[in-house]
A protein has these predicted regions:
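Flexible loop/turn segments at secondary-structure boundaries
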Residues: 11-13, 45-48, 67-70, 107-111, ...
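Active-site neighborhood of glycoside hydrolase catalytic domains
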Residues: 55, 70-164
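Substrate-binding clefts and catalytic carboxylate motifs of secreted carbohydrate-active enzymes
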Residues: 101, 136-139, 148-151, 155-164, ...
Length: 267
């Protein structure tokens, strides 16, 4: 047994053109990254991925397929979840790389944030899955692998920095820090409020998620967009941004200044 004092990991997301990427390419990329772990959410990777992580000594955090929402607890849906969990656990439980099963991504945390803001603490539908059904199946099928009911989780607030894991979205999203049980301020949207320098305020024991929106490669934009829309102020460009279209302006304003060309935006 060895205690892990530092973990450097990356999210592993299914590529839209996965069929065009060879196993050899994937293996080479993972070797180049020199990581100690990978987190999977949004899908269950195939056996090749887990075999490769076994070979490279990477630890895998595997989410079940729930995120950021209420989920039914009726008999039909529960039976479907049971079948899915049994199928995936039996397939993956013998991999040495499997370090942790996680019940969901952000369901408890987002529910708590919304309740603190609105004052409406409607019970979270889906807790029966994360607190009873899934851990019950794991106790029977894979009692050796740790289970985490959700991410983030721990402490007096699911996203508390006091214990457990934390999703740090003060930077970019403006989510107020939660050093203990409650958010310390209102949501931020100003350049100062969402600045990357606020990472210094994070005292979390384990930060399992953070990030800033990044632009795709210029070649990708040119491939898919009308040439007339290749400008950071065009409606066609802004409409393709998944998050609030002007959110990046606050990040760039005090660091690089606002972009004048699409190349500026990408850079």
């Amino acid at each position: 047994d060895k205690t892990v004092f530092e973990l450097q990991a990356r999210d592993w997301r299914k590529s839209g053109d996965q069929a065009e990427i060879s196993g050899k390419q994937i293996a080479e990329w993972m070797r180049q990254l020199k990581l100690s772990g990978a987190g999977n959410y949004g899908y269950y990777p195939d056996d090749f991925f887990f075999d490769l992580c076994d070979e490279l000594g990477l630890m895998v955090w595997q989410d079940f397929m729930f995120a950021c929402a209420h989920y039914p607890e009726d008999a039909v849906f529960t039976a479907s979840v049971r079948a899915e969990v049994e199928d995936q656990v039996l397939r993956l439980r013998n991999h040495a790389c499997l370090a942790l099963w996680c019940g969901n991504n952000e369901s408890q945390a987002m529910h708590r944030i919304n309740a603190d803001i609105s004052g409406d603490d409607t019970p979270l539908s889906g807790l029966a899955l994360y607190d009873d059904l899934i851990p019950g199946l794991l106790r029977m099928l894979d009692p050796e692998t740790p289970y985490w009911p959700g991410s983030p989780w721990g402490g007096p607030n699911p996203n508390s920095m006091r214990s457990g894991d934390v999703h740090d979205w003060t930077v970019w999203h403006g989510v107020p820090p939660i050093p203990d049980a409650y958010m310390t301020e209102a949501f931020a949207s100003s350049p100062k409020g969402v600045a990357y320098t606020r990472y210094a305020e994070d005292t979390a024991r384990f930060v399992s998620e953070f990030g800033i929106q990044g632009a795709p490669a210029l070649e990708t934009l040119r491939r898919w967009m009308d040439p007339a829309d290749l400008h950071p102020e065009s409606s066609g460009f802004l409409a393709r941004i998944k998050d609030e279209a002007r959110k990046a302006d606050a990040m760039m304003a005090t660091v690089t200044g606002l972009p004048e060309t699409i190349q500026d935006y990408v850079d």
